[in-house]
Amino acid sequence: MLKLKTIRFNAYNTRRNLPADTGRKRGESNFLGAFERYLLSSVYTCGVGGRYFPLSNYGMADFVWLLPAERKANATQGYLHSFETKLHDWRRAFQQAYRYSYFSDASFVVLPPTPGAVAEKYLSLFQTHSVGLWTFDPQASKLNQVFTPEMSAPRNPEAKKKAVQVIASRGNL
């Protein structure tokens, strides 16, 4: 598989659904950008993925990454991680990340430290549903992996196959 490759999924920009004054606020987008840069420079050393990954019936993940699986000759097989970033509303992020667990081997909620501390009080919810909880401080470029679920099969293997096909076609794998 490739070393590191980010791809554009050319998904519909959901910010267009918002009023003009709200649609220009880019806090969450900036947070996601900082998180993506950190992941690609410090966490992942190989794989392919990108921002705003739409999968029909499962929503649009803020960020997905396909990691190569050991001993698998086909580049389209591997481990799929999906991430949902939010600045405040951890409950909404949890709902979305849980939905991504249908096509991902692991899905994560990523929050800034302050809302992350609030979400930590409900850590048992994340553990029960195997949804990861990470906090990220963009100013300090510090990632805290509060809970990382064990790698497991997605809840819907056919949905994963479809997701991997979309990534493979966009990434020319």
Question: Regions from the language model: what does each represent?
Answer:
Residues 60, 64, 79-84:
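Short hydrophobic-acidic sequence motifs that mark active-site Asp/Glu residues
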